Design a protein with these regions (language model features):
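Conserved N-terminal subdomain of the carbohydrate kinase-like
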Residues: 44, 48-128
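Glycine-rich phosphate/adenosyl-contacting loop at the front of the ribokinase-like
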Residues: 1-69, 108-110
């Protein structure tokens, strides 16, 4: 089993549309994306992350549940917000701007992770 621990956030992908820059939200974050891709490749995968108790946190948690990971543990932080990544594509290159200052994903409560529930744990991936 692979356990990926780290950020889960909203990727807001920007597109120019009739002179306005509009954004569509997707669930993302490198550790979460790794978990999803490993699961799609046939691995047994768990993910642990942390979001704020906000509309973005509820959105990414609901989207994460659709990934059908073998284990999903998304903690909720009552004091901090969920990270947002604004992503634009200009001249064929991705440009990132993060709304990230003391956000929930930097404050995972490792004492609340019950590692014993992850049977046959072979790989632990930590990311930000």
């Amino acid at each position: 089993m692979i356990l990926s621990i780290g950020e889960i956030l909203a990727d807001l992908i920007g597109e120019k549309n009739d002179g306005a820059l509009t954004f569509r939200a997707f669930c993302g974050g490198a550790p979460f994306n790794l978990a999803v891709n490993a699961k799609q490749s046939g691995a047994t995968v768990g993910f642990v992350g942390r979001v704020g108790n906000d509309v973005i946190g509820r959105f990414v948690t609901a989207e994460a549940e659709k990934a059908n990971l073998d284990s999903l543990d998304v903690q909720t932080d009552e004091k901090r917000n969920t990270t947002i990544a604004f992503v634009t594509l200009m001249n064929g290159e991705r440009d990132f701007a993060f709304n990230r200052h003391d956000t929930a994903d930097f404050n995972i409560d490792f004492d609340k992770i019950y590692f014993a529930k992850y049977e046959n744990l072979n790989i632990v991936h930590l990311g930000s």
